[in-house]
Design a protein with these regions (language model features):
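Ligand-binding pocket scaffold of soluble enzyme catalytic domains
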Residues: 3, 15, 36, 111, ...
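Conserved GNAT acetyl-CoA-binding A-motif
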Residues: 118-130
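Conserved active-site alpha-helix within GNAT-family acetyltransferase domains
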Residues: 108, 120, 133-143
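Short loop/turn motifs at secondary-structure junctions
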Residues: 2, 91, 122-124
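Conserved acetyl-CoA-binding loop-helix of GNAT-fold acetyltransferases
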Residues: 97, 103-116, 142-143
Length: 143
């Protein structure tokens, strides 16, 4: 697998379609005694959801940060978009992996490379925001 910066020649890769993901539980975050903690609530029934497709503009993405693609034999498997921020951490704006390649380390490799590039830009690291009802994503980000 190759992790590459999305070039202008591959700008169409920024509009990788979103695919469905399973909603099977919720992460409940709390702060007790000056310590962060969380608990997990599993839904009685899971359901599937999909985000609307984005329409990213390559020039705008590059002006605000950078984008990485994960490729095998030039096939796009995953996408990560990072944005500059006024904080000391770069923002992971979007992360997606095709269903067929999820749980194979694609997202982790995209984040690893994004973290390296963020450090090169003078950031201390990266951060993101996750939806509490997307338990698979929340658990992934906790690793």
């Amino acid at each position: 697998m190759d992790i590459k910066l999305i070039s202008q020649e591959r700008a169409e890769d920024l509009n990788m379609p979103n695919e469905a993901f399973e909603l099977f539980g919720k992460l409940n975050v709390q702060r007790l005694d000056q310590q962060w903690d969380y608990s997990i609530h599993y839904f009685e029934e899971s359901k599937w959801d999909v985000f609307p497709d984005e329409s990213y503009d390559w020039q705008q993405v590059m002006t605000q940060g950078f984008a990485l693609g994960a490729y095998v034999d030039e096939q796009l498997l995953g996408l990560a978009i990072f944005q500059d921020d006024w904080k000391k951490f770069m923002y992971l704006h979007d992360l997606k992996v095709t269903q067929a390649f999820r749980k194979n380390g694609v997202a982790a490799e995209l984040i690893k490379k994004g973290h390296e590039l963020a450090l090169e830009r003078g950031y201390r690291g990266i951060y993101t925001i996750g939806q509490d009802n997307n338990l698979a994503a929340c658990r992934f980000y906790l690793k």
